[in-house]
């Protein structure tokens, strides 16, 4: 169960995260390393923005013709011998998965990394019918032992150090294991090898599905996905409906963008293309392959001019690494399966109760770093503004904030009214100004002054100073530099004639 489902708000989760010094340090260190790796990889490749635009155009075209490419993929996948299922909701996808497990009389399922599986809460569903689900990605395995959810799309256990991991694995081993990376990885490798050999079903996600051949492509660094797709007799692939690309030639662009954006690699250690179940001449592979194509709210974005580009996402995690908010609070503070800027937009899109996730759109500074990092140029910062606007239009906005903005508009809409308010502010601030600073933490100043200092209103405003300049310009008693006087005189003439000056 997520933090949001337990009743915590975004603010409460963020406050908890900000109070966790280790979490902030670990997330900041790892995201900075990933961000720098991506930057260097992009610079080394060259023409990066051109490649981003190529990727964007491929995704725009694919999503605009999604029904065509989904049908093409399904037809070709079935021709290859795979069983293709379409699930409108998370509940349908889970029901299909459980039915396959029951038909196979499965006792255990080995899984490679899949955010869609997390989205469906599939492990809990499998456990409810007595099927053991084992995560085989190292980070996911650690998170599973800790009974937690991933806090990063690419690095699920970004919030844990090796000493914490050693404690989890020692409990699993029944003996104390040293906090040595090689020893810990060796233990997990041995443990999982037994699970691979005993598993009845292998379950994967899908990085890209190739419509022209009905193939699926998986990117990974550990080799566990290869084991998942070759050892068990039955394979289930969970695939968000937007994972389609038209052709293998399009994969060249995506294979250039995804690894560099995710981890700074030219290419992941393993890239597997899977086309149907095992054939007679194949040495390994599943006897049965099931592909579950999942909607779960995705189709609601189709045709929406503000949010359709959300479906362009290739799940690289670059926006998380660039986001100053994510780098301070980590992933769990967002409360859903997906975190960071993409999660702040995608979570409300996938959840039925949008109002429950209203505040998540405020977990952003709107700086646009996510857009600059995105390999397919998704304008996430604009989408966050759209979400905020829709919340207000639906009558779910903060009443005090709405009243304050209306008051601000009234004041700023009239110069005389603005000057009068400033004069009142100068009088009122005398009660709280100390040494030129306002440090009180009450009312609207509480949030700001907790971490910063509000400067006092200056004695002379810009308007006051400009009025003095005009007086000096037209006064014989106060001589002015002739060159300055000439420029100001021309400026004043232009203002009178409706110009803007040079």
Please annotate each region the language model reported.
Residues 311-318:
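Conserved, hydrophobic alpha-helical core segments of structured domains
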């Amino acid at each position: 169960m997520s933090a949001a489902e337990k009743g915590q708000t975004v603010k409460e989760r963020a406050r908890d995260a900000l109070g966790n010094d280790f979490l902030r340090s670990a997330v900041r260190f790892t995201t900075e390393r990933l961000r720098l790796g991506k930057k260097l990889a992009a610079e080394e490749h060259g023409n990066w923005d051109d490649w981003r635009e190529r990727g964007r155009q491929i995704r725009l075209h694919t999503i605009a013709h999604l029904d065509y490419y989904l049908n093409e993929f399904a037809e070709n996948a079935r021709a290859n011998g795979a069983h293709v299922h379409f699930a409108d909701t998370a509940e349908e996808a889970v029901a299909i998965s459980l039915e396959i497990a029951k038909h196979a009389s499965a006792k255990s399922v080995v899984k490679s990394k899949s955010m869609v599986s997390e989205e469906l809460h599939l492990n809990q569903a499998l456990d409810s019918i007595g099927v053991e689900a084992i995560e085989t990605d190292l980070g996911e395995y650690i998170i599973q032992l800790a009974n937690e959810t991933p806090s990063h799309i690419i690095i699920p256990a970004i919030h844990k150090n090796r000493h914490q991991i050693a404690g989890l694995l020692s409990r699993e081993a029944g003996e104390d294991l040293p906090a040595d990376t090689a020893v810990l990885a060796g233990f997990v490798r041995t443990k999982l090898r037994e699970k691979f050999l005993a598993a009845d079903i292998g379950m994967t996600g899908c990085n890209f599905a190739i419509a022209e051949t009905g193939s699926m492509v998986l990117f990974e660094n550990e080799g566990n996905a290869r084991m998942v797709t070759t050892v068990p007799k039955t394979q289930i692939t969970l695939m968000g409906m937007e994972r389609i690309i038209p052709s293998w030639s399009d994969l060249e662009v995506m294979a250039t963008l995804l690894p560099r954006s995710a981890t700074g690699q030219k290419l992941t250690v393993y890239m597997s293309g899977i086309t149907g179940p095992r054939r007679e001449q194949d040495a390994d592979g599943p006897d049965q392959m099931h592909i579950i194509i999942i909607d779960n709210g995705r189709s609601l974005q189709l045709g929406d001019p503000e949010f359709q580009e959300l479906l362009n996402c290739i799940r690289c995690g670059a926006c998380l690494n660039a986001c100053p908010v994510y780098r301070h609070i980590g992933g769990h503070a967002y409360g859903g399966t997906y975190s960071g800027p993409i999660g702040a937009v995608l979570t409300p899109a996938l959840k039925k109760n949008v109002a429950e996730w209203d505040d998540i759109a405020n977990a952003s500074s709107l700086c646009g770093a996510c857009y600059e990092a995105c390999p397919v140029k998704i304008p996430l910062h604009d989408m966050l503004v759209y979400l905020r606007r829709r919340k207000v239009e639906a009558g779910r906005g903060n009443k005090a904030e709405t009243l304050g903005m209306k008051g601000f508009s009234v004041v700023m809409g009239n110069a005389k009214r603005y000057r009068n308010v400033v004069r009142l502010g100068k009088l009122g601030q005398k009660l709280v100004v100390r040494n030129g600073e306002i440090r009180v933490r009450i009312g609207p100043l509480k949030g700001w002054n907790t971490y910063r200092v509000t400067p006092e209103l200056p004695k002379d405003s810009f308007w006051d100073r400009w009025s003095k300049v005009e007086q000096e310009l037209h006064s014989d008693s106060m001589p002015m530099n002739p060159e300055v006087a000439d420029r100001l005189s021309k400026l004043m003439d232009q203002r009178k004639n409706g110009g803007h000056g040079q």
